[in-house]
Amino acid sequence: MPDAIMSRIAILGCTLVLVGGWPAAKAQEPPIMLVPHRAIYDLTLGQARDNAQVASVRGRILYDFDGNACEGYTLQFRQVSELDSGEGKVSTSDLRSNTWEDADARRFKFTSENFLDQNLIDTVDGNAEHRASATAINLEKPEHKSLDIGATVVFPTQQMVRVIAAARAGGNILDFPVFDGSDTGDKVYDTLTVIGRKLATDDRKHDDAAAGVAKLDGVPRWPVKISYFEKTGERKNTEQTPVYAIGFELYENGISRALSLDYNDFVVSGKLSSLEIKDVKPCP
């Protein structure tokens, strides 16, 4: 699997990061509170399109979120995938990342390592901060670099909060740029989010780890698809092909199930195989 594509899988972990005490979509609604949780998703090949040189995919994604409104929120993420071309060639990718975001979504720290067949091919280490007129990015790896990006760019936690707030309010389309520290650590992606109709809360006959979890009883959820595009500054063509797209069922508390990772040539399905909902740590 191409390295750039594998690194895009990290966006899922970033978008599910824990947050507490964010503004609600409407004044009368309670604040958006995403629960800390540890989730494992088993990956398989869902669909191979005509030009895909992929016979099978298997792998696993691990997410571990923690933190509180005083210390900020951390995400430990690891994704291992094995791709078989069907011609005797099997490649294994191992992507590991750690992020921290403060409770105000103003500062963001990120590190990642990407291994291909046990060889380290990419390392990223940096931080970003929202300022008055721009967002400043400072990189230590892969090279020392500083740059400013647009002030309207959002970090992963804020991205997911906006999605949930829009879903609560009955919205179905969101369009804004996102910076998550993936790839080379200096790229901004335009995103297009499509939110479907709220699913029935009593329709939970799942065959995955979400089934029978009492803490999910009565929690609203929506089908969501987020597409990521190269940022050109003038994305007007609705036919532009996204670099990557992810679909999932999103609970109001931030837990996701039924993943669909679309890389254009092929689609990977992610089944929630393990879920641990943690207690929220109080501020000291």
Report residues per predicted region:
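Beta-strand elements of well-folded, non-transmembrane domains
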Residues: 43-47, 63-69, 81-85, 99-103, ...
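Hydrophobic/aromatic-rich structural module bridging two neighboring secondary-structure elements via a short loop
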Residues: 77-131
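Mature, soluble, non-transmembrane domains
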Residues: 111-284
